[in-house]
Amino acid sequence: QFPVFDEIEMVSRRNEIDILVTKRDVITVHYEGLQALEEAKRSFSRPSVLKEAFRSQMHLTYFILKKLIEFSQRQLDHIDEKVEAVAKKLFKNHEKEVLREISYLKRDLSEYRIIVRSQEHFIKSLLEAGVKFWGTESRVYLHDVLGDYIKLANQLEDYREAVSDFEDTNNQLMNIKTIEVAKTFTILSFMTFPFVLLAAIFSMNTRDTPLVSEAHGFWIILAIMVSGMLGM
């Protein structure tokens, strides 16, 4: 299984390829077009590549696996670009936009990780069986493939940690803004409470309420409230 980025859904999807190796042939089976395999075929147009790849079934298998992992590596490029874009938007008052982009990134990283993790078991199994099938000469080639996979897995983990750190930072920035807004509303509530209370008192329909029955009672009460606001 190898990841291919879906630009419409903004997530990595899996492409599957089966490789059957016999003493004489290397057979690949896939159910849809695989760009990595097409690139491998086109590279055979160079005589030096063709000669090296077709030295034996082991060399051809090694060549195909290298191309597939190189393709998986390139599929990380869009993730690298998005991680860089998110990093640049931090601390620039784009918390909602950053949160949305991080959500897409986390989904893409999770799908990518699920797909490529199956490669580890396959490569390790091939390393064990390949030495028995092709001989000890194949060990160095298969270890090279495993090394490429480990490099890919480590880079993927670095991106996951970076995105997690960005998410924590963005959440802290959003919390700070929420606290500031809550503080502002608390101050406003405290400042307006005396006037709300004053208005409630003078709105009571009682005979002894002061100023209400005066000729200019409304304006007197309004002047008191405005003076109080200006005094604050």
Segments from the language model and where they lie:
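Long amphipathic alpha-helical coiled-coil segments
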Residues: 126-139, 163-175
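Peripheral, non-transmembrane regulatory/ligand-interaction domains of membrane transport proteins
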Residues: 1-135, 141-144, 148-158, 211-213, ...
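Hydrophobic alpha-helical transmembrane segments and their immediately adjacent juxtamembrane loops
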Residues: 147-232
